[in-house]
A protein has these predicted regions:
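RNase H-like, Mg2+-dependent phosphodiesterase core
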Residues: 1-181, 191, 195-206
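Short, non-ligating residues that shape and space the ligands of small metal-coordination modules
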Residues: 187-189
Length: 206
């Protein structure tokens, strides 16, 4: 028996990311969502990696993974932390990264499309084959009602080139630096100039 984990929406402007788990032997499928807030102001902190891991572990628990059951994970970098955590929990011999195709891919994709339709947006039929066209189609939908910005991954640094996003959410490229308090490497949404201390998100909250 094998459980296959895939994602949909990582490269799409709208909504968060759907993560689904599928047991091919029984056609069982379940999914959950990384909230879009992880792709907004805190995007450069990459907290979505830990959230992806949390969701994957929850979905596998929900499917009641059996001893020795193989778990195959999509090759996408969104699962880097999840793979590490899964290997620690279930063993390296159980976990592998694959290119997901077929039924699990279809189910996760359909779940993402259902979620964005729930926002009131109708996706392009050829969205997968025309990613650039889909991006601008989504952006146009947001532009007709700027209140829809709350549904967008506004933390993407590349969006700063578009007036629609820069005027609402001033997006700066993330810079790697050292936290002045704990000494750990962290990313901040500005370029440190050495004139003031810089704190990671954990130390900032303390």
């Amino acid at each position: 028996m094998t459980i296959i984990v895939d994602d949909a929406g990582s490269g799409d402007l709208l909504f968060g990311v759907v993560i689904g788990a599928y047991r091919e032997d029984t056609d069982q499928f379940t999914y959950d969502v990384i909230d879009v807030s992880f792709y907004q102001e805190v995007f450069c902190e990459k907290k979505f990696l830990n959230e992806a891991s949390r969701i994957v572990l929850k979905l596998i628990k929900k499917l009641k993974a059996k001893p020795g059951e193989k778990i195959q994970i999509c090759q996408g970098c969104i699962f880097d932390t999840a793979v590490t955590d899964l290997k620690e929990k279930y063993g390296e011999e159980i976990i592998s990264k694959i290119r997901v195709i077929g039924e699990p891919q279809r189910l996760v994709e359909e779940s993402y499309l259902d979620e964005i339709r729930n926002l009131g947006y109708e996706p392009l039929k050829d969205r997968e084959s025309k990613r650039a066209k889909s991006f601008f189609h989504m952006m146009k939908w947001i532009k007709t009602n700027p209140k829809r910005l709350k549904f967008a991954k506004t933390g993407w640094p590349r969006l700063k080139r578009y007036k629609l996003f820069s005027r609402v959410n001033k997006i700066e490229p993330c810079s790697k630096t050292i936290c002045s308090k704990c000494g750990k490497t962290c990313e901040v949404p500005f370029k440190p100039d050495g004139s003031r201390p810089v704190f990671c998100s954990d130390c900032w909250k303390k």
